[in-house]
Amino acid sequence: MRILLTNDDGIHAEGLSVLERIARTISDDVWVVAPEVDQSGLAHSLTLSEPLRLRPVSERRFALRGTPTDCVIMAVKKILDRKPDLVLSGVNVGANLADDVTYSGTVAGAIEGTLQGIRSIALSQAYQHAVGRDVPWDVAETHAPALIRTLMGVDLPDGTLINLNFPNCAVDAVAGVEVTSQGKLEFGLSIDERTDGRGFPYFWLRFGERAGDFRSGTDIRALRDNRISVTPLKLDMTDHAAQERIAQALREGSVA
């Protein structure tokens, strides 16, 4: 089985090394095409305003001056002589839960793999966001191989990818695996305005206290309870429940 790896934290990220070790427990045909630099938060974006620069790092490992989406496209369309059987994106430093998935370059790597007709899985490792806190990579590294093997045997509908999130706990404290839905997460975003040395303003996005929907069955609740979250995501974002309401409103409004 051929496996393609990518991420959004960059070619030198520790999570990518973890993912390589995970992948090599499953196959000896592992390829890496990852961003040259950190591309976190760029979601499913393409690089269209500048050229893509590809740099071989070592055998079957490449760094691309581009986004995770660019990386998957470059691998499938240029580097590989045939499509991989599996795309793994991650392991991200930090969870990608709830509304995070719309911003996530990690999830986007799996989205692009799915668009290319390849079984794709995004992997993220939760940790305590504080200076000096260690990321418990061993949780993902211990539990991911068996999960991936199981998920490869599931007959998923076309256009479906898997989003895996591993809890912030010790390996032996993991309380199981749960199939979840996306929760709801408020980021507490604000704008931090500062002034440079010439007196001109500049800005940073600032994350405040997060508020989450911890209802049973959500990805947020699973991680809070030290369970591994397995969330199937669909590329088709049509709100089918709203279609008839909108159609009825248009009919009543006599819109042609």
From Swiss-Prot:
The keyword Nucleotide-binding applies. Its main location: cytoplasm. One of its GO terms (cellular component) is cytoplasm. NCBIfam families: PRK00346.1-4, surE. Belongs to the SurE nucleotidase family. Nucleotidase that shows phosphatase activity on nucleoside 5'-monophosphates. This is 5'-nucleotidase SurE.
